[in-house]
């Protein structure tokens, strides 16, 4: 059995653990045809063996503990997979929601749960991974290993020690003039916008029910990739999605709060893995930035996209180095003190919580699962969310389709309200792309 310390991101997601809003990362694939139960369970075991953090559990800690530790079991303590059948798409939605809404314990290994859903027209493999154990990119990598093992194809691992890189070392950062200018600009913009709080989405059909609902929509990728505004402004697909989310949130507030919103903020997770292994390693290697727009910057879809693209371009130029350095500078001490501070900060800082979160895993190409044994027809992903934000958007694309998941707290919206917001989001995206 191995033992390794948490990195600062693992700790943050542990401190944010709320059983009524579990910090689960949703990742799932649908295939053409049916999975064999026993063969898939065996493939899951092979994949867990490939990735140490997928077999991790939290070592019990005391008030004097200075660093949380992961215990890496040679063999997982429990079988994470269950098998169910779905007769309708509504059944699939319910199963998906229940899986992501059920707390995943990190005191036993593996820190995840899997559900095989038999459905006419193609089976689903759904994973719910505790965010303390992995971010979305790591979850996608684990899913890839499961599917490769099932298809009996090679699953090459990068030439690195996943437990060593898990320390989250701060990359060397020697900014040039351009990087310094962009960093200064970002800080100036942040300071200028401190005079107003982020807007929050008004509830619609909210209940006291714990957990999440998840609305799933898929769109053709080509009209988004080839959008004229994208070419004109040098924007990315992610920029278009953030812009659509920003406009949709603003319109929702205008409609349901009868007010003109000021500052709409979108949390944008950033993959801090180096380019040499950008899509590798189960674990947490993600920082985040906030894309903020004022009402003046949202007067048109073009203006909003220009503002968003300018901000994300500056973020890319600066890179993750400063954010990782800031995280590394957090004072040490007993974990009990840091846990208490994190809980206080979460409550005290609720007014500063962002309007929504949009996490994009990018495009999965054919080589991701290069086999004739399995045909992937759908991929779904969503990040966890908590009130007062209450809405987390997840995006992932294949060669020709974009899959969007809208995860909402039941304490914010009903399924009907989320469906209305999804329509608003798609309308905004259409406006940007035409």
Cite the ranges covered by each PLM segment:
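Flexible, P/S/T/G-rich "lid" or insertion loops adjacent to the active sites of thioester-utilizing
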Residues: 181-235
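Long, internal scaffold/assembly segments composed of regular secondary structure
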Residues: 212-287, 291-293
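Helical lid/core segments from catalytic subdomains that handle acyl or acyl-like groups
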Residues: 214-216, 280-369
């Amino acid at each position: 059995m191995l033992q390794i310390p948490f990195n600062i991101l693992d700790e943050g997601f542990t401190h944010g653990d709320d059983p009524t809003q579990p910090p689960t990362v949703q990742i799932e694939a649908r295939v053409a045809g049916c999975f064999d139960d026993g063969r898939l369970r065996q493939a899951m075991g092979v994949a867990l063996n490939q990735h140490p953090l997928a077999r991790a559990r939290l070592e019990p800690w005391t008030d004097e503990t200075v660093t949380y530790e992961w215990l890496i079991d040679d063999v997982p303590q429990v079988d994470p997979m269950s098998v169910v059948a779905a007769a309708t798409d509504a059944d699939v939605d319910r199963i998906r929601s229940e899986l992501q809404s059920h707390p995943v314990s990190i005191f036993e290994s593996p820190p995840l749960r899997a559900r095989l859903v038999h459905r006419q027209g193609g089976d689903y493999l759904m994973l719910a991974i505790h965010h303390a154990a992995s971010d979305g990119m790591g979850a996608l990598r684990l899913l890839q290993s499961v599917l490769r093992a099932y298809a009996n194809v090679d699953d090459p691992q990068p030439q690195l020690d996943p437990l060593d890189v898990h320390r989250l070392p701060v990359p060397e950062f020697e900014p040039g003039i351009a990087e310094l200018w962009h960093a200064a600009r970002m800080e100036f913009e942040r300071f200028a916008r401190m005079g107003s709080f982020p807007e929050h989405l008004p509830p619609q059909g909210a209940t006291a029910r714990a957990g999440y609902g998840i609305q799933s929509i898929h769109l053709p990728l080509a009209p988004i990739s080839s959008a004229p505004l994208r070419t004109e402004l040098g924007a990315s697909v992610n920029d278009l999605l953030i812009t659509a989310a920003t406009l949709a949130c603003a319109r929702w507030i205008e409609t349901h709060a009868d007010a003109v919103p000021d500052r709409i903020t979108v949390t944008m997770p950033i993959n801090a893995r180096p380019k040499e292994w950008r899509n590798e390693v189960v674990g947490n290697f993600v920082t985040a930035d906030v894309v903020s727009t004022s009402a003046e910057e949202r007067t048109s879809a073009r203006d909003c996209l220009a503002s968003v693209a300018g901000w994300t371009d500056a973020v890319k130029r600066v890179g993750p180095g400063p954010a990782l350095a800031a995280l590394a500078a957090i004072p040490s001490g007993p974990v009990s003190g840091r846990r208490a501070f994190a809980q206080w900060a979460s409550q005290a800082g609720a007014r500063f919580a962002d309007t929504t979160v949009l996490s994009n895993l990018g495009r999965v190409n054919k080589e991701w699962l290069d086999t004739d044994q399995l045909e992937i027809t759908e991929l779904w992903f969503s990040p966890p969310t908590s009130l007062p934000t209450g809405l987390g958007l997840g995006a992932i694309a294949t060669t020709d389709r974009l899959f969007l998941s809208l995860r909402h707290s039941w304490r914010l919206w009903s399924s009907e309200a989320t469906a209305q917001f999804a329509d608003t989001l798609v309308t905004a995206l259409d406006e940007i792309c035409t």
